[in-house]
């Protein structure tokens, strides 16, 4: 938020002032400095507030309906001290955004050549959308600034032994303060589109209740800068930064209350920004239910609700409620709000092949896809969960009512896949039938094994950083996956977008100087190979791929691995927050020229 922006609301320095404003006046919240941008009307029933938990008189336990500085202070007290970075106010774009200042590689070593010679002269359709992606918690920093409430990841990162390198998202790249410079640099580099996420606990510090006025001003200005720069905006509403207040109250994704709370957040954000956003992703990788619930909710980290303490039952109630929350937003967006853009959610999945020619290994691949993509893709394309999932889980899997099936089916406008890697799948000892009926089997409920090593003993492609053992550079796998998803798994989909793909250069964080890290040859090779195979899928295989998003805009907080694993197309110096484009950035950009 620009320091010069003034509030049209009266603000008391030590208390929270709540005002209900008629919907026709809501755009005035940011119009004073809008430079001709007009934001959408706020639906009836929303209130606004400013928050400053550091002005709390005395932090104390609060009721779920209390939205005060005191209550917010209690939430932040769960974390302990928050680290401040070197920048703590919005910075204007400077000369570093001048494209002429970007050093490029190639003096004595050229770029990576094309992999698929048959498509060297082929072109993608003019309507193909491409750009770079990032997420709020991973890049914004400013963890407790300007009224933001803590997210579950704020808490997890502040708990020892959760993040491998004991770093947090408190500061990271400080995009919250440096967004003007970042957007100017994207424009100078020639990046046509950006796919960030917005932060739920910034807009709603308690997950619901009054909207944080300062968050609105901030994101208003982010959108304004994007429009001014001519960069298309494609926004994810949820990228894992669940408001901690909702976890404290009812466990979030284990209680149906979360559907209405997410809808309340999504409705406000979409209503305000839809005219400037081309695509809404309700959720980033709802498969997060599969792996994050091995960590939470768990009694030593977070409260436990409804007898869910992690593991398989929690995974699938989370998956079920996430689907319903998505569908409720999508139905409103299409039928009532009649939005201008497209809406879907981003899936996490990788291409799998049988580890051998055996029938057991073939079934292992199918089960792998059923339990990752099928749980989420089946209901919106075919109207229900995969049969193998239902048979294995029985009563553990919540049943979709006919009304819910009708709401979910067709709720996505296209299939979005975050496709990074590939693997082989194999039958577990004893076979799938024995595993299916034995919940104590370590492989249950998926009842298959996975490896990145092929049957010939070779790894399927050059490996990524040692801290992301699942990641290999296997570009042909992505091409086959795009064919498999659209022609075999979900033939009803009209088009598919690769919403994330990227690579963690091995040992990149170990260099004592920045300059060696900038020549990230394996990452450059990765992007060349993956883009070549996306193009081949389009022009040679007839797959309707309509977009691709490189991950990531720059180095960021990589969840359980922290800051020491780097996925960025730009190098971030976490001491002074300077960003420098890597060789992979130019490999990526030059491919589209």
Language-model regions, residue ranges each:
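Active-site region of glycoside hydrolase catalytic domains
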Residues: 31-127, 131-157, 206-207, 220-593
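Bacterial N-terminal signal peptides that target proteins for export
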Residues: 3-12
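N-terminal signal peptide
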Residues: 2-3, 16-42
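Active-site-adjacent substrate/metal-binding segments within catalytic domains
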Residues: 141-219
